[in-house]
């Protein structure tokens, strides 16, 4: 399940950058990419919940990582909304980077992650 989760969030990030790029260009297909992106949000959340469910003893850090992951998805939506409205998205991009960094750090720190830290 770990590989499915990693694959889903990697595809989500790629689709996010594609959606932002298409939104900036005013491409008509941006809406379709955003709908596919939202589908991958759901896949990422479901695989994350399945990973949480598979852990025998869940520490508070796992719950914190889950909340940080939801924060990443929320920040993605805020960036896309700001881009669509033509507003400055600098603060939202900063929030997304911080949320992603926290989530990746916790994901790599916890026992189910890779042994980097």
Curated annotation (Swiss-Prot):
Q: What is this protein called?
A: UPF0344 protein GK0697
Q: Which organism is it from?
A: Geobacillus kaustophilus (strain HTA426)
The protein's topology relative to the membrane is: Multi-pass membrane protein
GO cellular component entries: plasma membrane
Q: Where in the cell is it found?
A: Cell membrane
Similarity section? Belongs to the UPF0344 family.
Keyword entries, A-Z: Cell membrane, Membrane, Transmembrane, Transmembrane helix
NCBIfam families xref list: PRK13673.1-3
What InterPro entries does the record tag this protein with? UPF0344
User: Which Pfam families does the annotation name?
Assistant: DUF1516
Q: What is its main location?
A: membrane
The answer on whether this UniProt entry bears the keyword Kinase reads no
Q: Which residues cross the membrane?
A: 1-21, 39-59, 60-80, 97-117
């Amino acid at each position: 399940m770990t590989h499915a989760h990693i694959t889903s969030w990697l595809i989500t990030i790629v689709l996010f950058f594609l959606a932002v790029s298409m939104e900036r260009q005013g491409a008509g297909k941006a809406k379709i990419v955003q709908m596919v992106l939202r589908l991958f949000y759901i896949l990422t959340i479901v695989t994350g919940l399945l990973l949480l469910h598979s852990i025998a003893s869940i520490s508070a850090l796992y719950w914190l990582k889950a909340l940080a992951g939801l924060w990443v998805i929320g920040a993605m939506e805020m960036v896309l909304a700001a881009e669509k409205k033509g507003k400055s998205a600098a603060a939202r991009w900063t929030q997304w980077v911080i949320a992603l960094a926290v989530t990746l750090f916790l994901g790599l720190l916890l026992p189910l992650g890779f042994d980097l830290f």
